A protein has these predicted regions:
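Short, low-complexity disordered leader/linker segments with a strong preference
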Residues: 1-32, 57-58, 62, 105-115
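Hinge/cleft segment of the Venus flytrap/periplasmic-binding protein
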Residues: 168-181, 185, 196-198, 311-355
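Extracytoplasmic "Venus flytrap"
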Residues: 31-51, 55-56, 63-81, 85-87, ...
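Flexible loop/hinge segments that line or gate small-molecule binding clefts
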Residues: 106-144, 148, 160-171, 175-177, ...
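Hydrophobic alpha-helical segments within soluble ligand-binding/sensing domains
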Residues: 33, 75, 136-169, 188, ...
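Hydrophobic alpha-helical
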Residues: 92-112, 193, 217-296
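Beta-alpha junction/loop-to-helix N-cap segments that form part of ligand/metal-binding clefts
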Residues: 69-142, 260-263
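Short, solvent-exposed amphipathic alpha-helices that sit
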Residues: 44-59, 145-149, 184-212, 216, ...
Length: 355
């Protein structure tokens, strides 16, 4: 009986050491790669996840994907669960990219468990990430997508101005769909997508773009859920088309979206109204960002005009390699492909895509 009691006590103590997770007890060596997604519902991130799974499977690594379904609270709880279960590295696509508090909380959790931490895709603070030597960020030059989208839009408008100016007033009216408030990528794409298009138009002697609704001082429509979703793009466009039309002489002549999902949602609404069907009728130019497979198909079908490619495979490979480097105690950016920024970040380049 004494031997049985001693054995039970030993098991309880062993479990306690694992459950506490903290400090050196939570060594990253040999643990699984815990990957936290802000949502499984994002089309671009689904392509990143598929590429990441492929790379991890090829390397024989143990990993687990977690879906926060848009909830920062859920994601934070998932991270703690993974730490307690013995994760070897935390890979985080943060839900609340606008919150330094959320970022700091995740960093503190990683620090307390002595675990490497890789943020990716959704922007986080340089100051916070740089303060933890086992942390890194994989993203993009968030201003680049907006600049490239704006240039692409401006060049397309200049080349096709009269056909796009449906009411012949000499000005192109547009709508801008913004993915999320407080998100640096969304802010930059919203700003530069218009500013750079205007610069190209000005160089060609054309007037600046004009937001379709003069009463909207922000000059964009934002996904109130911060989900960058096709549903929001479609709902907004459907509402617009009830008041703005060719018959009324005020049709929206250009659609700019922060991502492909919102662009594709707008296209669905346009097609329901008889536009963008490649049937000899009117096509409203629609631009997005990501170059998802569905967007590429839409461009091939001529229902979408162009997009900016965000390299899903490149991002996935960089995240996996950095995570594995950190777990192995190597230089975090060893053999990583991309544009390094200081000692905290690597950017995956964009490219224009029009078919």
């Amino acid at each position: 009986m004494k031997k049985i009691i001693a054995l039970l006590l030993a098991l309880v103590m062993a479990f306690g050491l694992v459950a506490c997770g903290g400090g050196e007890a939570a060594s990253s060596e040999g643990g699984e790669i815990a990957i936290f997604w802000y949502t499984f519902g994002d089309t671009y991130l689904s392509s990143v996840r598929a590429a990441m799974n492929e790379a991890l499977n090829a390397s024989g690594a143990k990993y687990h994907n977690y879906d926060a379904n848009g909830s920062q609270t859920t994601q934070t709880e998932q991270i703690q669960t993974a730490i307690t279960a013995g994760a070897g590295v935390l890979v985080v696509n943060i839900v609340d990219a606008s919150s330094d508090d959320a970022t700091q909380a995740i960093i503190d959790m990683a620090k307390n468990a002595n675990l490497p931490l890789v943020f990716f895709n959704r922007s986080v603070s340089e100051e916070l990430v740089s303060a933890y030597d086992k942390a890194a960020y994989v993203g993009t030059d968030y201003t680049m997508a907006g600049h490239m989208e704006g240039k692409m839009i401006g060049e397309h408008l200049v080349a096709n101005y009269d056909a796009i100016d449906l009411n012949g007033d000499g000005v192109i009216s547009y709508v801008m769909f913004k993915g999320q408030e407080g998100n640096m990528e969304a802010d930059a794409r919203t700003q530069y997508g218009v500013e750079d298009a205007d610069a190209v138009l000005a160089a060609a002697g054309k007037p600046a773009l004009e937001f379709y609704d003069a009463s909207n001082t922000s000059k964009y429509l934002v996904d109130q859920n911060g989900a960058w979703s096709a549903a929001e793009g479609q709902n907004y466009m459907q509402t617009i088309l009830t008041q703005y039309s060719e018959a009324n002489g005020n049709m929206v002549e250009l659609v700019i979206a922060n991502n492909d999902d919102m662009a594709l949602g707008a296209i669905a609404a346009l097609q329901a109204a008889g536009y963008n069907k490649n049937d000899g009728g009117v096509t409203i130019p629609v631009f997005g960002v990501d170059a998802t497979a569905v967007a590429q198909e839409a461009i091939a079908a001529k229902s979408m005009t162009g997009t900016i490619k965000q390299d899903a495979v490149g991002m996935a490979n960089a995240v996996v390699l950095i995570a594995q480097n950190l777990m192995a105690g190597k230089d975090k950016f060893e053999n990583v492909q991309g544009d390094l920024e200081g000692t905290w970040r690597v950017n995956i380049p964009y490219s224009a895509y029009s078919g």
